Structure formats: C-alpha cells, structure tokens
C-alpha cells in the first residue's frame, strides 16, 4: 500500500539499496542521527537525502519523496530551496553515487538548481 515500506528489493541509479527487512531499522537510525542535529546546514540536508536514497524505503517514488523532503527542509531552515530539473538529472545521479568520495558533484548540482530557483524568486521580487 502507499506509504508502506518496500516488500521487494529495488535499486537507484545502479546502486544497491537496503534490503526490505533492513528498512525500518535503517530509517529509524537515519532519522535519529538527523534529528539530533539542532540546526541543519545545506550539507546536512544533502547528506540526509543521499542516505535516504540509499535506503530507498518505498517500493516506488523514493526520488520524488526524497527531493520533496529536501525542499521542505530547506524551507524549514531558511535555506533557498531548489528543484532538480531534467537537465540536471544525470549530474544529480552522479552526485548521489559519488557522495562518499566527492561531495562536490551533488553539492554543485544542487547549488546550480538553487541558483535557478533564485532567478524565479528574483523575477517575482521575493526576498531570500
């Protein structure tokens, strides 16, 4: 059912994800770790996202849910949010894959997306 943790193994961008029987414990650990941080930075939000995507807790829709969580967390912590548009998808997936070795790929991709979002805010004269 929608919202239930996955029952079958799945993958993202060629990466293995948590086994269905590991999901509940891994999600609990991830949320405990993340919520222990009082103020979240841009990097904290990206790090949470990478870990969430590696768990891939749901059968489908994990990417959308994960990116929506990033958007919400940016708003919550007064960080300009961003949307990963199609032209950034390949860089985004590379960033997810390379996060442990090189945080710059995902960080730069998300900062590029954030710059685009700032253009929209500027156009509508919305302060940030």
Language model regions located:
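FIC/Doc superfamily catalytic core
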Residues: 1-128
């Amino acid at each position: 059912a929608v919202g239930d943790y996955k029952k079958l193994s799945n993958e993202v961008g060629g990466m293995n994800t948590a086994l269905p029987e590991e999901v509940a414990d891994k999600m609990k650990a991830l949320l405990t770790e993340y919520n222990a941080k009082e103020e979240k930075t841009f990097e904290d939000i990206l790090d949470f996202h990478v870990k969430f995507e590696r768990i891939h807790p749901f059968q489908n829709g994990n990417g959308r849910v994960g990116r929506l969580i990033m958007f919400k967390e940016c708003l919550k912590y007064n960080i300009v949010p961003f949307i990963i548009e199609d032209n950034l998808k390949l860089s985004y997936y590379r960033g997810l894959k390379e996060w442990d070795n090189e945080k710059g790929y995902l960080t730069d991709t998300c900062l590029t997306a954030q710059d685009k979002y700032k253009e929209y805010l500027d156009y509508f004269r919305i302060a940030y």
